[in-house]
């Protein structure tokens, strides 16, 4: 889009190095439905190449793959020795069911995967399934994130789909702070309605639309650091979260440096909103990967150190959060686990 090309040139003149984002978007399929942005919106069609449109649809084409929907997995059962999972127990339509298999992969997300394994405690695994290290549920991480609006009152933003560029000039440790600050990427186009709903004070719709017409939304991400006391727990059947924020000094430095870049690039009005603990930004870390069974939950192939046929294939296994979207890394680790299974690991 011409407007985005102009923003890119302005950023380059301001001294940063914007690059194109990797996108799993079929733009033609998306825009066929409606001329709307896609960032933060689900899509029931095929415009957004999410897990369902991509790998799940391909997997379901195989005759030996099936999907059970509306099922709430309550626990995994093991043999008497606790070395192998023999069944997953789930509830569907008010009834309890069991499904047996040779191997089990847990991929419910950093909170729910940890909770499932903690609920699956037994005589052989009193602290939770696969938790001899006492690391299960610990080291919960959730990115430090801020939304930034850069507004140019003299130039309209005509983009429909704008989440296409990012810059990492402040990511590496070669700055005056001595440690990484994070990633900056465009948000999807902020509409007047979105802006009106998120403004800290009430504002008329016309004012929100006017602001949105001249605004570019940016998403700033910094690492959350692993802390054993940031954890997911299960008490009386309920999930309990205890998250201790970290690395906010780096995030505040990222905000300051990015604000300076935007102003240098010709955006005199820069507004920011740092998200709190209610915002789930790439949760990870609760079943960390590692070579040492005493300090990690799964091995380098995402297999449980304690249970030979149990794998965890979601962001739970990430030992650090980095400061970028984790989906491609999670996919790569799942492929690595699949390769290990096919080798008979």
Where are the language model's segments positioned?
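FAD cofactor-binding and catalytic pocket of flavoenzymes
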Residues: 15, 92, 133-248, 252, ...
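Conserved redox-cofactor binding core of oxidoreductases
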Residues: 1-73, 276-277, 283, 288
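A short acidic-Thr-Gly-centered motif at the start of a beta-strand
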Residues: 57-61, 91-98, 289, 295-305
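Alpha-helix capping and helix-loop boundary segments enriched in small/acidic/polar residues
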Residues: 43-50, 92, 127-131, 135, ...
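A conserved FAD-binding loop/helix module that cradles the flavin
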Residues: 319-341
